[in-house]
Amino acid sequence: MAEQTETSTAGYNYVSYGTEQHPIAGLSRVVRHITGHDSEGRSVFLSTDIGDHHRTLGEKQAISNIIYSTNQTPVELNGNHDIEFARNTEPGLHVKDGSVARLIDFAPGVESPLHRAVSLDYGVVIEGVFKMVLDSGEERIMRPGDISVQRATAHKWINVTGNGTLPGRMLFVLLDCNDVYVNGKKMEGYLGTLAKDYEGRSS
């Protein structure tokens, strides 16, 4: 079992497993299957792998696996343009006019900083139990199969699996959206201490 050490930094509370491996120790291996067509128009598997882009977030308290990303709507599938983009581009938090499917493994007890993505986000609990907290103070407990629909709202995630003693996993699908206004005030995105994890990446 990977070494566990108590760690604390601004904006985060977590137990670090002290590893950058994917998946995080204690979670199942993830396999991605991409399909397409052969020369006769039959459906075929083009690849089976574990994804193109993996990144440790923060101080090893979470690991991101980009399942797929696109940069236009509708998506151009002809000529495998979408596959080339997904393979060659590690996206930012979200992609303008596009989409990002991101799997995140959370170490035990991780609490993310409060943040807002100006996008439409679907969050699905795959393994574990999570608490979703909004900037209003409202919160919900989410279990495997539960889904959140974040409409450019400020929130944070807390991995409460096993009362904070076990890792957990969520899938996030982020879609670009128009600017959002509330009573004439534009809702601005902010990432807090997450910002450094997305610097210099395509968005």
From Swiss-Prot:
Disruption phenotype: Impairs the production of flavoglaucin and congeners. The keyword Oxidoreductase applies. It comes from the Eukaryota. Keywords: Oxidoreductase. Disulfide bonds: none annotated. CDD domains: cupin_BLL6423-like. Its EC number is 1.-.-.-. Residues 105-171 are annotated as: Cupin-like domain. The keyword Oxidoreductase applies. One of its GO terms (molecular function) is oxidoreductase activity. Pathway: Secondary metabolite biosynthesis. InterPro entries: OryJ/VirC-like (IPR047142), RmlC-like_jellyroll (IPR014710), RmlC_Cupin_sf (IPR011051). It is an enzyme of class 1 (oxidoreductase). Signal peptide: none annotated. PANTHER family: CUPIN TYPE-2 DOMAIN-CONTAINING PROTEIN, SLR2101 PROTEIN. The PKS fogA releases the carboxylic acid (8E,10E,12E)-3,5,7-trihydroxytetradeca-8,10,12-trienoic acid as its product, as well as derivatives with one and two double bonds. Belongs to the virC family. This is Cupin-domain-containing oxidoreductase fogC.
